[in-house]
Amino acid sequence: HRIARRQRQMCIRDRLEYEYMPAQLKEPYISRKRAVGYALYELYGIKRDDYPARKAAGLRNFEFFGAPVGIFFRMDRELLHGSWLDVGMFMQNIMILARGKGLETCPQQAWCEFGPIVHKVLNIPDEEIIISGMSMGYAAEAPENTLVSERVPLDEFTTFLS
């Protein structure tokens, strides 16, 4: 939680490790992103125009949502797209393994917003990029843990060929 303290002290968004979304997110992605955000704020009891409360809710990312374990995934900055896929598959394997042991996980891309703080606090070399964080622990009785985001039908994003 040293990172969360440092982030709150700075109270600014650091240099991004990478751009997660385009600056101008197009449809249908922007509507989907907003729908999940609004649903989450509703579970928290936060009104859409309550920006301080929305920010405070977002900052819970940087406390790993109170989970007892926080994991960072990183790799050499020079590696390309295929290696990002490898990290994602590795993360998924950890998530499946954790679930099999009765643990819950939450992958957290939000850490890309504070890469330099993570680097400094954890003494991570600049040659490495922070890909993601992940919270891990036993499920808590928390409003956000009841959120089930809407999924588009399989045939809208997949083509099966035989």
Q: Which residues does each PLM region occupy?
A:
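Single conserved hydrophobic/aromatic residue that forms the stacking wall/gate
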Residues: 1-12
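Short, charged/polar surface micro-motifs in flexible loops or helix N-caps
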Residues: 5-6, 77-78, 140
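C-terminal helix-cap and adjacent tail motif
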Residues: 13, 17, 22-32, 129-162
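Alpha-helix-centered segments that form part of catalytic cores
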Residues: 26-73
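Glycine-rich, charged/polar anion/phosphate-binding loops
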Residues: 55-58, 118-121, 143
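Short coil/turn connectors at secondary-structure junctions
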Residues: 66-68, 126-130
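Small-aliphatic-rich amphipathic alpha-helix that forms the alpha element of a beta-alpha
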Residues: 67-121
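Short proline/glycine-enriched turn/loop segments at secondary-structure junctions
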Residues: 119-126, 146-148
